[in-house]
Amino acid sequence: MPVAVGPYGQSQPNCFDRVKMGFMMGFAVGMAAGALFGTFSCLRFGMRGRELMGGVGKTMMQSGGTFGTFMAIGMGIRC
């Protein structure tokens, strides 16, 4: 399949770059959502200090990885 050329002679990103970009965007959105939901959840359980930071960080990484994976799969389907 020939490489599509955009305006001004710029080439389009290949499929791997699109999947990588989808993962990074999804990871960023998931981290932000994880920060909000993780903070709320940990504060509801009465966590403070180091325990709070660990719980929020764990939630951020989990939600970022999950949402990033789904976004990468979605971008891979679109290739």
From Swiss-Prot:
UniProt keyword list: Antibiotic, Antimicrobial, Membrane, Mitochondrion, Mitochondrion inner membrane, Transmembrane, Transmembrane helix
Any one Gene Ontology BP term: replicative senescence
Predominant place of localization: mitochondrion
Any single GO CC term annotated in Swiss-Prot or TrEMBL for this entry: mitochondrion
Location in or out of the cell: Mitochondrion inner membrane
Topology of this chain in the membrane: Single-pass membrane protein
Ranges where the record places region Sufficient for antibacterial activity: 42-60
Transmembrane domains' residue ranges: 23-43
Record-stated family: Belongs to the MGR2 family.
Function noted in UniProt: Has antibacterial activity against a variety of bacteria including S.aureus, P.aeruginosa and M.tuberculosis. Acts by inducing bacterial membrane breakage.
Name of the protein: Reactive oxygen species modulator 1
Protein's organism: Xenopus laevis
Gene: romo1
